[in-house]
Swiss-Prot record:
It is found in: Cytoplasm. Required for rescue of stalled ribosomes mediated by trans-translation. Binds to transfer-messenger RNA (tmRNA), required for stable association of tmRNA with ribosomes. tmRNA and SmpB together mimic tRNA shape, replacing the anticodon stem-loop with SmpB. tmRNA is encoded by the ssrA gene; the 2 termini fold to resemble tRNA(Ala) and it encodes a 'tag peptide', a short internal open reading frame. During trans-translation Ala-aminoacylated tmRNA acts like a tRNA, entering the A-site of stalled ribosomes, displacing the stalled mRNA. GO terms for molecular function: RNA binding. It comes from Oceanobacillus iheyensis (strain DSM 14371 / CIP 107618 / JCM 11309 / KCTC 3954 / HTE831). GO terms for biological process: trans-translation. This is SsrA-binding protein. Its main location: cytoplasm. One of its GO terms (cellular component) is cytosol. Residues 132-155 are annotated as: Disordered. Keywords: Cytoplasm, RNA-binding. Belongs to the SmpB family. Gene3D superfamilies: 2.40.280.10. It holds the Pfam family SmpB.
Amino acid sequence: MPKGNGKVIAQNKKASHDYFIEDTYEAGIVLHGTEIKSIRNGRVNIKDSHARIDRKGEVQLINLHIAEYEQGNRYNHDPTRSRKLLLHRKEIDKLIGLTQQQGYALVPLKIYLKNGFAKVLIGLGKGKKKYDKREDLKQKQMKRDVDRAIKDHMR
């Protein structure tokens, strides 16, 4: 199955607005039992999260909010703890070199279930400037106007 396919649980639409996504990587997430149950219920928020490579060479997903499981008891998890991502060593080494360049960041694009496992699609993004964002909004509006005109003309 190609990367990014599966039942999408959460999607980060703000990432394409704030970053030029140059490359994507599929990674597994190390989770506790109540976390995967909350993810299956769709109670996850990736809007303000990002990934970082620590000194040990491990990729951590920071500020990912997975709500506590309702039926969980005292063994429930911390909602915003950092979670380890599972990638191949070659991919991590490549990401270390790329993220040390100025303006690059690792951004989670979506969380999905693939063969029963929770996966995250992380993108290597270069931050957009304010004028880039405005230009994208103009192009989006022009495309919407053209599509609307074509639809009206077809009637």
